A protein has these predicted regions:
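Long, low-complexity, intrinsically disordered polar/charged segments
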Residues: 1-3, 112-113
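Exposed, interaction-prone regions of secreted/extracellular proteins
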Residues: 24-271
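Secretory targeting and sorting signals
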Residues: 2-23
Length: 271
């Protein structure tokens, strides 16, 4: 796998999130960011785990489902994780990402679960869509010219959020299904990948993307799929990392659109 690039969900810690539903506490660094892939000098990433697909034609939509994982909060140290589908953000020089998903964060020993969307580089929006561990979540991001439609549904409760938005320069160069270690950014734009929540395993299903005239799953031979592994101890990445754990995706299932990402504790240093 080639080196991977970086943007993300940016949550301002100093402002109350719009229409927040049990919003997860935010880090004191100033911004909690999700989005483009942080690249490293290895085959892995310091912030993304999952799959991305690319094609010479622009993508029009991406869809996926996952079961909201339960956060294990072992002590008072804050940890963060995000699960989402999106368009853009994968290319090395990506300038934007359109994404929606859920968070599983720990703060003060307690777990918090939140739904959100983001059209990076605009800040993210927290949603009044209650999410609990074990809930099945369905997400779709679709783009036509400068119109972005976000659709996020808690399939378990039947609650649905949908919104049509304007975005001047959407990135349609890739489609992704990702578990992420968010980044904390100060107000000068310096960012660090934050400690990754122990989420156990998150199962993605119904993963599809569309380009003009074609809809397919991750393993569709029409496009090129890349497996992305998150390694919290990589050297030579584009930004510092405090992820402190790995997140490793399994193989895509026989249906072509399902896979699992598993949190892994870092092995102790040797020597």
């Amino acid at each position: 796998m080639r080196r991977l690039a970086a943007i993300g969900l940016c949550i301002a810690a100093v402002a109350a999130p719009a229409t927040a539903a049990r919003a997860a506490p935010q880090p004191g660094l100033g911004l909690l960011q999700h989005g483009t892939l942080v690249r490293s000098d290895t085959e892995a990433s310091t912030n993304w785990a999952g799959y991305a697909v690319v094609h010479k034609k622009p993508f029009a939509s991406v869809t996926g489902r996952w079961v909201q994982p339960s956060a294990t909060c072992s002590d008072s140290s804050p940890t963060y994780s995000a699960f989402w589908v999106g368009l853009g953000g994968f290319a090395r020089r990506s300038f934007a990402v359109e994404q929606t998903g859920t968070l599983a964060n720990c703060e003060g020993g307690s777990a918090y679960y939140t739904a959100w969307y983001e059209l990076y580089p605009a800040p993210p929006v927290m949603l009044n869509l209650p999410i609990r561990p074990g809930d099945t979540v369905s997400a779709t991001v679709s783009v036509k010219k400068q119109t972005v439609v976000i659709r996020l549904k808690n399939v378990t409760t039947g609650k649905l959020f949908t919104k049509k938005l304007h975005m001047k320069r959407p990135d349609l160069g890739s489609a992704e299904w990702v578990a992420e270690a968010p980044s904390g950014c100060d107000f000068t734009g310096n960012c660090t990948t934050l400690p990754l929540t122990n989420f156990g395993t998150v199962d993605f299903t119904h993963s599809t993307a569309t380009i003009k005239g074609h809809k397919g799953r991750i393993s569709d031979p029409v496009w090129t799929a890349t497996t992305i592994e998150l390694h919290g101890d990589l050297a030579g990445s584009d930004q510092p990392s405090q992820a402190g754990a790995n997140a490793i995706p399994g193989a895509v299932g026989a249906d072509g659109g399902s896979f699992a990402v598993t949190w892994q504790q870092l092995a102790p240093p040797t020597g």
